[in-house]
Amino acid sequence: MIKISKKAKKYIIKLLSKQELGTNIRIFVDSPGTMYAECGMAYCDMNDIDKKNDHKFSFDFFDVYIHKLMLPFLKDSIIDLVKNDLGTKITLKAPYAKILNKSKNFSQLQNSIKNFLTTQINPKLLLHGGSVALYDITDSGVVFLKFSGGCNGCSMIDITLKKGIEKKLIKNFPEISSVEDVTHHISGKHSYY
């Protein structure tokens, strides 16, 4: 799934040696499946790991964690180390980061859900400076949403998603089986809570 060159492994181990014990690496994709997709790597401590949704890839002396929804976008990824006149940097090449596989009947259901999010959900989220957008729908009826603004990094996002948005979507669209969040959450001043 993910290949890391020997030089990149040594470099990552060196970087991790300067962090707290138990720190690993998280790989993510912002705006996956769009022309704006960007891959990234970040430090990941044990408290940041979601055992239910994160997939672990073990390497010598460290692990790499990827949210299960990001796996298709990071298929055949290569992490390498590049040295040039400006210094050394890690590169992450992900050939599928910008590719989105749309499911059957996506267009009709997509439009209905987008309209519902725009008229029923986003007006409430906008009160907190946030919004949500439809990201994808699978053949099995799983809806993927991406949060932004005040919702990104908000500590209440799981409750908002599961107790609010998911219940309303399933009630209004019986073909939906569940709703998942694909947002790469970063807490900050922009976050509502």
Curated annotation (Swiss-Prot):
**Which InterPro entries does the protein's record reference?**
Fe/S_biogenesis_protein_NfuA (IPR017726), FeS_biogenesis (IPR000361), FSCA_dom_sf (IPR034904), HesB-like_dom_sf (IPR035903), NIF_FeS_clus_asmbl_NifU_C (IPR001075)
Which cofactor does the UniProt annotation name?
Answer: [4Fe-4S] cluster
Q: Which residues bind [4Fe-4S] cluster?
A: 151, 154
Q: Name one GO molecular function term.
A: 4 iron, 4 sulfur cluster binding
User: What span is annotated as the signal peptide, if there is one?
Assistant: none
List keywords of the entry alphabetically: 4Fe-4S, Iron, Iron-sulfur, Metal-binding
State how the cofactor is bound.
Binds 1 [4Fe-4S] cluster per subunit. The cluster is presumably bound at the interface of two monomers.
- According to its UniProt record, which protein family does this protein belong to? Belongs to the NfuA family.
Q: List, alphabetically, the PANTHER family matched.
A: FE_S BIOGENESIS PROTEIN NFUA (PTHR11178:SF51), IRON-SULFUR CLUSTER SCAFFOLD PROTEIN NFU-RELATED (PTHR11178)
The subunit structure is: Homodimer.
Q: What is the role of the protein in this entry?
A: Involved in iron-sulfur cluster biogenesis. Binds a 4Fe-4S cluster, can transfer this cluster to apoproteins, and thereby intervenes in the maturation of Fe/S proteins. Could also act as a scaffold/chaperone for damaged Fe/S proteins.
Name of protein:
Fe/S biogenesis protein NfuA
Gene assigned in the entry: nfuA
